[in-house]
Protein backbone atom coordinates (compact mmCIF):
# COMPACT_ATOMS: atom_id res chain seq x y z
CA UNK A 1 0.00 0.00 0.00
CA UNK A 2 1.24 3.46 -0.89
CA UNK A 3 1.49 5.94 1.97
CA UNK A 4 -0.01 9.37 1.42
CA UNK A 5 2.46 12.26 1.65
CA UNK A 6 1.06 15.14 3.70
CA UNK A 7 3.97 17.56 3.27
CA UNK A 8 7.57 18.00 2.20
CA UNK A 9 9.99 19.96 4.39
CA UNK A 10 13.34 21.24 3.13
CA UNK A 11 16.12 21.90 5.65
CA UNK A 12 19.81 22.76 5.26
CA UNK A 13 21.68 21.38 8.26
CA UNK A 14 25.32 20.96 9.29
CA UNK A 15 26.53 17.46 8.40
CA UNK A 16 26.74 15.14 11.40
CA UNK A 17 25.73 17.91 13.83
CA UNK A 18 21.94 18.20 13.57
CA UNK A 19 20.12 18.73 16.88
CA UNK A 20 16.42 18.76 17.85
CA UNK A 21 16.72 22.52 18.47
CA UNK A 22 15.49 24.99 15.85
CA UNK A 23 15.23 24.74 12.87
CA UNK A 24 14.67 20.95 13.07
CA UNK A 25 12.33 20.80 16.08
CA UNK A 26 9.73 23.35 14.97
CA UNK A 27 9.80 22.26 11.31
CA UNK A 28 9.18 18.57 12.06
CA UNK A 29 7.37 18.83 15.41
CA UNK A 30 4.38 20.63 13.93
CA UNK A 31 3.79 17.57 11.74
CA UNK A 32 4.12 15.07 14.61
CA UNK A 33 7.34 13.47 13.37
CA UNK A 34 9.73 11.73 15.79
CA UNK A 35 12.42 14.43 15.80
CA UNK A 36 15.13 12.38 17.55
CA UNK A 37 14.74 9.57 15.03
CA UNK A 38 15.29 12.04 12.17
CA UNK A 39 18.28 13.69 13.90
CA UNK A 40 20.00 10.34 14.57
CA UNK A 41 19.41 9.09 11.02
CA UNK A 42 20.53 12.39 9.44
CA UNK A 43 23.70 12.53 11.55
CA UNK A 44 24.54 8.90 10.73
CA UNK A 45 24.09 9.44 6.98
CA UNK A 46 26.13 12.69 6.92
CA UNK A 47 28.90 11.70 9.36
CA UNK A 48 31.60 11.50 6.66
CA UNK A 49 30.76 14.99 5.29
CA UNK A 50 31.31 16.97 8.51
CA UNK A 51 32.02 20.65 8.00
CA UNK A 52 29.51 21.01 5.17
CA UNK A 53 25.91 22.11 5.05
CA UNK A 54 23.85 19.27 3.57
CA UNK A 55 20.29 20.03 2.45
CA UNK A 56 17.66 17.38 3.19
CA UNK A 57 14.24 17.05 1.59
CA UNK A 58 11.96 15.32 4.11
CA UNK A 59 8.68 13.73 3.00
CA UNK A 60 6.23 13.33 5.86
CA UNK A 61 3.47 10.75 5.54
CA UNK A 62 -0.04 10.55 6.98
CA UNK A 63 1.03 8.00 9.62
CA UNK A 64 3.73 10.47 10.90
CA UNK A 65 6.55 8.44 9.38
CA UNK A 66 9.08 10.09 7.09
CA UNK A 67 11.73 9.53 4.45
CA UNK A 68 14.39 11.96 3.39
CA UNK A 69 16.75 12.55 0.50
CA UNK A 70 20.14 14.17 1.00
CA UNK A 71 21.23 16.70 -1.61
CA UNK A 72 24.69 17.99 -2.45
CA UNK A 73 25.96 21.05 -0.58
CA UNK A 74 24.99 24.42 -2.11
CA UNK A 75 27.34 25.70 -4.83
CA UNK A 76 28.23 28.71 -2.66
CA UNK A 77 29.49 26.41 0.13
CA UNK A 78 31.54 24.35 -2.35
CA UNK A 79 33.01 27.54 -3.83
CA UNK A 80 33.91 28.87 -0.36
CA UNK A 81 35.65 25.59 0.49
CA UNK A 82 37.54 25.55 -2.82
CA UNK A 83 38.78 29.13 -2.44
CA UNK A 84 39.23 29.12 1.34
CA UNK A 85 37.17 32.27 1.89
CA UNK A 86 34.88 32.82 4.88
CA UNK A 87 32.36 35.19 3.30
CA UNK A 88 31.34 36.35 -0.14
CA UNK A 89 31.61 40.02 -1.01
CA UNK A 90 28.72 42.45 -0.77
CA UNK A 91 29.88 44.25 -3.94
CA UNK A 92 30.80 41.49 -6.44
CA UNK A 93 31.54 43.77 -9.41
CA UNK A 94 33.85 46.07 -7.44
CA UNK A 95 35.49 43.78 -4.89
CA UNK A 96 37.14 40.39 -5.44
CA UNK A 97 37.56 38.14 -2.38
CA UNK A 98 39.29 35.22 -4.05
CA UNK A 99 39.97 33.32 -7.23
CA UNK A 100 39.28 29.81 -8.47
CA UNK A 101 40.64 27.80 -11.38
CA UNK A 102 38.47 26.64 -14.26
CA UNK A 103 39.31 23.03 -13.33
CA UNK A 104 37.87 23.50 -9.82
CA UNK A 105 34.74 25.05 -11.38
CA UNK A 106 34.43 21.94 -13.57
CA UNK A 107 34.72 19.66 -10.51
CA UNK A 108 32.01 21.59 -8.66
CA UNK A 109 29.78 21.50 -11.76
CA UNK A 110 30.21 17.71 -11.95
CA UNK A 111 29.16 17.39 -8.30
CA UNK A 112 26.12 19.67 -8.75
CA UNK A 113 24.96 18.67 -12.27
CA UNK A 114 22.16 16.36 -11.06
CA UNK A 115 20.57 19.21 -9.10
CA UNK A 116 20.94 21.99 -11.67
CA UNK A 117 18.46 22.94 -14.40
CA UNK A 118 20.62 21.31 -17.06
CA UNK A 119 22.23 18.00 -17.90
CA UNK A 120 24.84 19.63 -20.17
CA UNK A 121 28.21 20.00 -18.39
CA UNK A 122 29.19 23.18 -20.26
CA UNK A 123 25.95 24.88 -19.16
CA UNK A 124 26.43 23.61 -15.60
CA UNK A 125 29.92 25.14 -15.61
CA UNK A 126 28.44 28.50 -16.70
CA UNK A 127 25.91 28.33 -13.84
CA UNK A 128 28.69 27.70 -11.30
CA UNK A 129 30.83 30.46 -12.87
CA UNK A 130 27.90 32.86 -12.46
CA UNK A 131 27.55 31.91 -8.81
CA UNK A 132 31.29 32.45 -8.29
CA UNK A 133 31.21 35.87 -9.96
CA UNK A 134 28.21 36.93 -7.84
CA UNK A 135 30.20 35.97 -4.74
CA UNK A 136 33.18 38.09 -5.80
CA UNK A 137 35.32 35.12 -6.82
CA UNK A 138 37.24 35.54 -10.07
CA UNK A 139 37.51 32.56 -12.41
CA UNK A 140 40.99 31.93 -13.83
CA UNK A 141 40.92 30.31 -17.25
From Swiss-Prot:
PANTHER family tied to this protein = 60S RIBOSOMAL PROTEIN L12, LARGE RIBOSOMAL SUBUNIT PROTEIN UL11M
Name the SUPFAM superfamilies on file: Ribosomal L11/L12e N-terminal domain (SSF54747), Ribosomal protein L11, C-terminal domain (SSF46906)
The subcellular location is: Plastid, Chloroplast
- Please give the Pfam families that the UniProt record associates with this protein: Ribosomal_L11, Ribosomal_L11_N
Any one Gene Ontology BP term = translation
User: Is rRNA-binding there in the keyword field?
Assistant: yes
Tell whether Repeat is among the UniProt keywords. Answer: no
Q: Name one GO molecular function term.
A: structural constituent of ribosome
Function summary: Forms part of the ribosomal stalk which helps the ribosome interact with GTP-bound translation factors.
Keyword terms of this UniProt record? Chloroplast, Plastid, Ribonucleoprotein, Ribosomal protein, RNA-binding, rRNA-binding
Matches recorded under CDD domains: Ribosomal_L11 (cd00349)
Q: How does it assemble?
A: Part of the ribosomal stalk of the 50S ribosomal subunit. Interacts with L10 and the large rRNA to form the base of the stalk. L10 forms an elongated spine to which L12 dimers bind in a sequential fashion forming a multimeric L10(L12)X complex.
Q: What name is this protein filed under?
A: Large ribosomal subunit protein uL11c
Amino acid sequence: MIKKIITTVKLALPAGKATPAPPVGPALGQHGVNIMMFVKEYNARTEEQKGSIIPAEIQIYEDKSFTFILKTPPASILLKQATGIEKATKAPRREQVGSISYKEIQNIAKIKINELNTKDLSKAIKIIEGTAKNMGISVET
